Amino acid sequence: MGTIFDLKNISYSYVGEITVLKDISFKVDPGEQISIIGSNGSGKSTLLSLLDGLIYPTVGEFYAFDNKIVEEVFDTIKDNEFRSYFRTKVGFLFQNSDVQLFSPTVFEEVAFGPLQLNITPEEVKTRVLEVLEMMELTKLKDRSPHTLSGGEKKKLCIATVLATNPDVLLLDEPTAGLDPRTQLWLTELLQELGSMGKTIIIATHDLELVEQISKRAIVMGEDHRIVVDGDVEKVLNDLNLLLSTNLIHEHMHMHGKLVHEHLHAHDKEHAHEHKN
């Protein structure tokens, strides 16, 4: 398999007026684990939606699996062979779980994707039961998705993505709203999927998750452009970069003659530094 995604000088504007992506260019190769990080409103979720073929560039060119993604071809022609191929290869996790859930039961929710593939009903059932067991959702298979807790809904949404066994996972704020135990479980799952060769791209401002599952970080600035595209360790050790892109912020306090400085991410506990 060649390059998975290739973005060339892409910009995107809502209703042709509000620009949320500016001059975005990068490539994604098979097996990469990438984090797209930036403050709220920097364009992370919009970029993921574009990678999933849900929206199309206002300016520039987007290629997926060496095919140019053009709305007139990708989204409007019935029985589009490449679109079907794309949907089997790429799985998308929405930030808001309720957007992704629509079936009467948990079992039917997970079965929906595999039923669109050319496999037998028996194979669908086997696959669904395996995924439910892996996600620790078997006891909930007859429940309505909308009666589940937030963490259970997130697990279910991940199950619906994994049920079609995609090569590429696009995950929008996957740890948002999860308790610490479920966050740890999800982190370990993503590490395992990465070791299996899955291509994983997440949009997040959870820097701890970025450090644990990614090797490459694409940093979005508040001007909706890519500021840095590079090694995760170098990015996370660059405090000036993290401060300038509003991924961490600092507070200064005086304790007598001691200046007490707090540096912390927006969703994490304070890290402390002292300066005389």
Swiss-Prot record:
It is a peripheral membrane protein. Gene3D superfamilies: P-loop containing nucleotide triphosphate hydrolases. It is an enzyme of class 7 (translocase). The keyword Transport applies. Its EC number is 7.-.-.-. It is found in: Cell membrane. Residues 5-247 form the ABC transporter domain. One of its GO terms (cellular component) is plasma membrane. The keyword Ligase does not apply. It comes from the Archaea. Keywords: ATP-binding, Cell membrane, Membrane, Nucleotide-binding, Translocase, Transport. One of its GO terms (biological process) is transmembrane transport. One of its GO terms (molecular function) is ATP hydrolysis activity. SUPFAM superfamilies: P-loop containing nucleoside triphosphate hydrolases. Pfam families: ABC_tran (PF00005). ATP binds at residues 38-45. PANTHER family: ABC TRANSPORTER ATP-BINDING PROTEIN MA_4021-RELATED. Belongs to the ABC transporter superfamily. Probably part of an ABC transporter complex. Responsible for energy coupling to the transport system. This is Putative ABC transporter ATP-binding protein MA_4021. It comes from Methanosarcina acetivorans (strain ATCC 35395 / DSM 2834 / JCM 12185 / C2A).
